[in-house]
Regions:
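ATP/NTP phosphate-donor binding region
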Residues: 14-116, 371
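Glycine/threonine-rich beta-strand-loop-alpha-helix active-site module
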Residues: 100-206
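Glycine-rich phosphate/pyrophosphate-binding beta-alpha loops
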Residues: 169, 274-312, 405-409
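Carboxylate- and glycine-rich phosphate/diphosphate-binding segment that chelates Mg2+/Mn2+
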Residues: 177-283
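Flexible, glycine/charged-enriched surface loops at secondary-structure junctions
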Residues: 234-243, 257-268, 283-288, 306-309, ...
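Gly/Pro-rich interdomain helix-loop hinge
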Residues: 301, 305, 309-390, 433
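Short, amphipathic C-terminal "tail helix"
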Residues: 389-435
């Protein structure tokens, strides 16, 4: 099976990357690259594309049961059998999948030896299956090696990969990223490499219509964050900008109505989040995601996670205020405000209007504005589940880990340790970013 791209190494600032990709840290580039799945099947009924797959064995990786409950898992299994394949299921992938789940799934793959891996559901089962795929193809690779930015060896020696999304946010069905949680450390780690971009994506809105309201809100704001961060990223380009802007406009028009039960808008959001994913997979992200990755599981010992999409929604307005101190980023945020029709005469006014719009959207979606008011059920609460003294005690380590996150290098303004701690405090207390 063929591999994507060239794997010659280049050392820049002590970080090894591939010469077919851009450097992750600041505005130093080799040849840029734009990578998408080879095929993308979309529209109602697109799941039937599985009937056309060629292979001998397929392993379907799924999560907690919604795909089975609504009949989509049975249909996928039947379509693959109609294609002449033997099918095995790997079920029960948890939200925010763990390293242990990845290793367990990879072991099942090694025993079954599929030539197609079919990941089906939300971001968690697809992300987990991507990491399982790496371990399946390279049994001796460690999780630490998987997390080396753009350091994955060539895949597709044993299997191809198809991702079928059932939620409208992560867009992992079209991206070069996977997020895996090390619960011993309380840290979410991004795996980033074009090798794990799926070969085939199936974007069937029938699956997304099953999402509960809270999930619509969180995944929708995840998608909005993807699009905005991609547009202001230091790796943005002519190929990613139109995708990001169009996704932002679609989310502006569709998310709140989708949340309130409009199924036509729900279908449109499924496309919007996919466009946002195409943009950020190639333009990269910023410190909203760095902070979300490092706070998500940081307080799990207090009985809850800060759900990724909700974390992005809370942090995005604060990060815009921080990044807008950089003139280039301020201009890009102004472009977004103009494209959304928010008004404003000066760039400062446009940035303020964009921030205000996003905060209103959070209100409409019942997402709190800060960690202090983030309830264990993710809804606004007078007293959230993260105690102030615990947050402050863990703050230095969380800030340091956020700075080291793979998404930080493409942020338009690089924070110091002190600035990251101050920014996280603003996200805890919902205070003004004035630095």
């Amino acid at each position: 099976m063929r591999s994507r791209g060239n794997t010659d190494g280049l050392i820049v600032k002590n970080i090894t990357i591939k010469t077919s990709t851009y450097i992750f840290y600041r505005r130093v580039f080799t040849m840029a690259r734009f990578t998408l799945p080879r095929d993308l099947y979309h529209g109602k009924g697109a799941l039937e594309a599985l009937k056309t797959f060629k292979g001998k064995k397929a392993m379907i990786c799924v999560g907690g049961g919604s795909m089975k409950r609504f009949g989509f898992l049975d249909r996928a299994e039947q379509y693959l059998k109609e294609a002449g394949m033997e099918v095995q299921l790997f079920e029960g992938i948890e939200p925010d999948p763990s390293v242990e789940t990845v290793m367990k799934g990879a072991k099942a793959m090694m025993e079954f030896e599929p030539d197609w891996i079919i990941a089906m559901g939300g971001g968690s089962p697809i992300d987990a299956a991507k990491a399982m795929w790496i371990k399946y193809e390279y049994p001796d690779i460690t999780f630490e090696d998987m997390c080396k930015v753009f350091g994955i060896p060539a895949l597709r020696n044993k299997a191809h990969f198809c991702a079928i999304s059932s939620t409208s946010g992560t867009a992992t069905e079209v991206t070069a990223f996977s997020i895996i949680t090390d619960y011993e450390k309380g840290i979410k780690y991004p795996i980033a490499d074009f090798e794990i971009t799926p070969d085939v994506a199936i974007v069937d809105p029938d699956l997304a219509e099953t999402m509960p309201q809270k999930l619509v809100a969180h995944t929708g704001m995840d998608a909005m964050t993807h699009a905005i961060e991609a547009y202001v990223s230091t790796a943005n380009c002519d190929f990613t900008d139109p995708l990001a802007l169009h996704a932002i406009k679609m989310i502006q028009n569709d998310l709140v109505d989708s949340y309130n039960g409009d199924m036509a808008k729900r279908d449109s959001m499924h496309n919007a989040q996919c466009l946002a994913g195409m943009a950020f997979s190639n333009a990269l992200l910023g410190i909203v995601h760095s902070m979300a990755h490092k706070t998500g599981a940081a307080f799990a010992d207090y009985g809850a996670h800060i759900i990724h999409g909700a974390a992005n929604a809370m942090y995005l307005p604060k990060v815009i205020a921080f990044n807008a101190k950089d003139e280039t980023a301020k201009k890009r945020y102004g472009d977004i405000a103009d494209f959304m029709g928010l008004g404003g005469d000066s760039l400062d006014e446009k940035v303020a209007l964009l921030i205000a719009y996003l905060r209103r959207m959070n209100d409409d979606l019942k997402i709190p504005h800060c960690i202090k008011n983030y309830g264990a059920d993710s809804y606004p609460a007078e007293q959230g589940f993260v105690p102030e003294e615990v947050f402050l005690e863990r703050l230095p380590e969380i800030a340091a880990n956020a700075i080291l996150d793979a998404c930080t290098g493409s942020n338009p303004r690089q924070p110091s340790q002190e600035e990251m701690e101050k920014l996280l405090k603003c996200c805890y207390y919902d205070t003004e970013v004035d630095f």
